[in-house]
Design a protein with these regions (language model features):
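Active-site loop-to-helix "anion-binding N-cap" substructures in soluble metabolic enzymes
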Residues: 1-169
Length: 169
């Protein structure tokens, strides 16, 4: 890309909520990112209502399936997935460790079914839901959490630096 971009954030909860972005539009954006040689960072996550209704798996699998429909592995394309429980974004609430492990496990399994074990093993699944310096290290230590998608805490340089340090070996 002429501007030096390497990643495209696709399907973020704010785009879905504020602009009514649909799964079909996410699919098209993943395809467009692929065509331009960008790594799509596909965001999936449930609302509080969907969570309370016991629909977490249904929602995140549906969203991931739509995104994967626009994805091609040809030419060494890459992909990242970010689980962002909508109810935890900007609220100061973070999903429990059990919630994160369960959701990331669902996403990992779906990736393996869809793109195969080898490719799926290379797809990092990020967590993005009120990540802050106090919880980053614990989140990063969980199974299938390959990184964090930082929102509000990235606006404070000191907070962001502490989160980055939590992810350093």
């Amino acid at each position: 890309m002429g501007a030096g971009a390497r990643f495209a954030l696709v399907g973020h909860s704010e785009r879905r909520h504020v602009f009514g972005e649909t799964d079909a539009e996410v699919e098209l954006k993943v395809s467009a990112a692929n065509a331009e040689g960008l790594t799509a960072v596909v965001c999936v996550g449930e609302t509080l209502e969907e969570r309370r209704a016991g629909r977490v798996k249904e929602v995140i699998v549906r969203q991931l399936n739509a995104a994967l429909s626009g994805f091609s592995q040809e030419g060494g394309k890459s992909l990242l997935v970010a689980y962002e429980p909508v109810w935890a974004i900007g609220t100061g609430e973070t999903a429990t460790a059990d919630d994160v492990v369960a959701a990331h496990g669902i996403l990992r399994s779906r990736l393996q079914e869809s793109v195969g074990d080898t490719f799926a093993a290379d797809v990092a699944i990020l967590y993005g839901g009120s990540v802050n310096p106090a919880n980053a290290a614990d989140l990063l230590a969980l199974p299938n959490v390959g990184g964090v998608l930082v929102g509000g805490a990235s606006l404070e340089p000191e907070s962001f630096a502490k989160i980055a340090e939590a992810g350093s070996p």
